[in-house]
Amino acid sequence: MKWISAEHYKALLALVLLLLFACQDADFPRPLHSDLLTESADNNLPPEPSSHIVDLESLDQAQLVKKATSNNFMVVTANPHATAAAKKILLQGGTAMDAAIAAQLVLGLVEPQSSGIGGGGFLLYWDAKQKTLKSYDGRETAPLSVDENLFFSPELGKTDKFFAAVLGGKSVGVPGLMKMLELAHQQHGELDWQQLFSPAIQLADQGFAVSERLNTLLRLVPKVKQREAIRQYFFDQQGEPWAIGAQLKNPEYAQTLVKLAEQGGDYLYRSELTQKIIIAVNQDDNAGYLTAKDFTEYQPLERTPVCRHVFNYRLCGMGPPSSGATTVLATLLILEQLAEPILAAGDEPIENNPLLAHYFIEALRLAFADRNTYVADPKFVPVPINQLLATDYLHSRAQLINAQRAMPVVVAGDLESPLSARFTTQGSPELESTTHLSIVDQLGNAVSMTTSIETAFGSRLMVGGFLLNNQLTDFSFSPTKNRFPVPNRVEP
């Protein structure tokens, strides 16, 4: 067999990333433009974020995969303001963890539709000195008083309609982001906690230019105006979204951040802000079930990362309850088996090979079928990660892929798992939302963090200058299917 170079592997991984982005769900309104995301110590941000807005459809493939390098550090976020905040913290001697917190607090201001302190997140941290990888689970939890019938009426035998469930307090889970960031900072931060809040507080007080992305989403996302606080903040007196470039201030968010900087995460979980959130949720027309006990008992968790060797790299990601790493690794491990002859031949540029694209799509379909059947919250159901990523099992899955045609039907594999015997599968609506950031600092420490308030603009409830999540609608609305329990049903 012909020797396969590292460059071939790198090129294939780059192709996979491009395909992952190209295969994003298209059911939700897509913003017309996106911000260029990368900042390094060797490059300065332009004075205005608008100069970083690029129409991705106008770029050719070479521009889309253009490399960005740095000798010092690298920051990738969804908004130039957040990138600038992270850069500032790094230049002050902060770690990647410090920078990630500063960036996230700014993202909650300038891209509030996607993430914020009213939501949750997952975080991976690589400690370069200790050579250790840690993962943190700060996702929202269901209130203690809800049950599996939160979005289901046993009497009528019907589930709530999706947006009827999303809007208002019923969909709000206990926010977890602040507690997770606080825990991670205690273990990996270098700068004082209060120092990390300065960029976001200053920007909230002084104002920021409304981006085309925010303006577009306010126009396109369904039912954004359903709650008064959102109408007052995001829309002008004529009921139109603030124009692109308009200066938007959020003094209420600034004050919330000041208190969080002074009092720590407890300000969100044990204070008057907690009571404001509970009142907003429980007194809404579509009332929820949050209590003070839900907040005081919330704890972020340290999880075990999921790691495998694939394409000459050791790739790691967040384990359950996140399904991301398990699904991506299964996809890549299947693809690795199918791609090896193509890589060894080296006949044409990998990015131009349609067979590789076909193999990737089919591998992804198989991985998602397993994900939807076997991956859930390990607190409630056993997740057979080792079986799902076993070499023999994935070899058998790869054999199902035909080089000439797509599989007509894709089903989950047959694992000897108690989950398959006790539970059935039922998907949840997949809508675009959420944000991700990646940071590597001067010492080689690295953060990979995904945060969310679930769908765009969350529950449409706004308290303290930030939006509350609608995470509970990420659970399956129906607790059973064909008389078998659904593993992703609502449970406290």
Predicted regions and their residues:
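Bacterial N-terminal signal peptides that target proteins for export
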Residues: 1-12
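C-terminal motif of bacterial Sec signal peptides marking the signal peptidase cleavage site
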Residues: 20-22
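Noncatalytic scaffold domains of N-terminal-nucleophile
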Residues: 29-84, 88, 96-264, 268-270, ...
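Internal maturation/activation junctions in enzymes
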Residues: 52-53, 340-452
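Active-site rim segments in enzyme catalytic domains, especially the processed small/beta chain
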Residues: 109-116, 120-126, 130-135, 288-291, ...
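Active-site Gly/Thr loop motif
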Residues: 287-311, 398-428, 469-492
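Glycine-rich phosphate/pyrophosphate-binding beta-alpha loops
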Residues: 316-325, 434-438, 448-460
